[in-house]
Amino acid sequence: MISLNKIIRHGVFHTERKNIRQKLSERENYIRLDLNENVLDLDASLFNEFVSGLTPEMLSAYPDLSKVYTEMATFLSVSEDELILTNGSDLAIKCLYDACIEKGDQIIVHDPYYLMYAFYASFSEAELVPIPVGADWQPDLAAMYASVTEKTKIVVIEAPSGNIGTKPSHQELRQLAAKLEQRNVLLVIDEAYHHVINNESENLDLIREFSNVVIIRTLSKVFGLAGARVGMLIGNEAIVHELYKVRPLYEISSLAAQAAKWRLAHTSLLDAYQQEISAAKVKLIEGLNRLDIPSKTTEGNFIIIYFPDTDGVDLYTLLRSHHVLIGKKYELPALQGWWRITLGNDLHHEKLLSALSTIRQQIRRIN
């Protein structure tokens, strides 16, 4: 028998990673408020329009991505040479690591962070340096900058955070970009949740003002294309030229490209989503207030609620028994007792509030 540890890269062999297929297969019959997907209802006529645009060649031929690049660049107000499409934002991160990160390099993130930043660092035998968020849950930019060393290649700021929904101001990011540029360090701004609040991002201007800024985006969240896997890297032409070298031969599939073009043809849906999510936040928080459950609004398509464990049983487990899924428990001590809940429609929230009310009553009877 061969010794896999002699063949598999050291960083890969010594990284533990769970198989999530079973978990995902069990979500079908639940209210899915766990992964920050767009769970709002899609108009049937719009979906039929997408289906009618599919052709046999989209399955049999290799992807021609010229049109989707043109349309995406136009939508973003960037040039095609400032853009790389990727198979979800996961592959955008991998593209950065493949091009930039070597054994012993450092990547600085704020904690909590998107888990793929840690996995790709481990595979490369690089060091991930997590800096806990401050008391206000904002990234501690001063502490992050103070952690920069000669080994630091990348500093990552999620704007907003996909875990707790906070983000620095544009001016703070601009100042950080300027300081990191002097240290020859990339600033990666992860905007996976952009478009939840509005359609404008001043951060795009930073890719031209500074030579060290890269922005990551995805169509998985607000655009509702999590299953299509469409992400992107945006940067100045010099950076993109280098990152483009490590792309797959075909960045995304023909079906993913068609889904992206279909969504870009209906950008009015973004405004409708923003309005619906904004109203949903207000209504859900009002419902939580009636149950005396503390909550925090966020810059993302989710809210955070406070519900400490009861007799060693956590809220995730309790709600799962009511066929409602929410985000998993935070590991950071300062966030213990808080839970992330994706925003859905009125029916989703009614079932969530009903389940929370029942759980509260059960706890009171026990106590």
Range-by-range predicted roles:
Residues 2-88, 95, 363:
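N-terminal small-domain helix-loop-helix segment of the aminotransferase-like
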Residues 79-83, 103-106, 151, 184, ...:
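Short acidic capping loops at alpha-helix termini that bridge into adjacent secondary structure
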Residues 99-157:
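PLP-dependent aminotransferase-like
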Residues 212-289, 293-296:
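PLP-dependent aminotransferase class I/II
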Residues 278, 290-322, 345:
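Conserved PLP-binding catalytic core of the aspartate aminotransferase-like
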Residues 282-307, 328-337, 367:
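Conserved small-domain helix->loop->beta segment predominantly found in fold-type I
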Residues 321-322, 331-367:
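PLP-dependent enzyme catalytic core of the Aspartate aminotransferase-like
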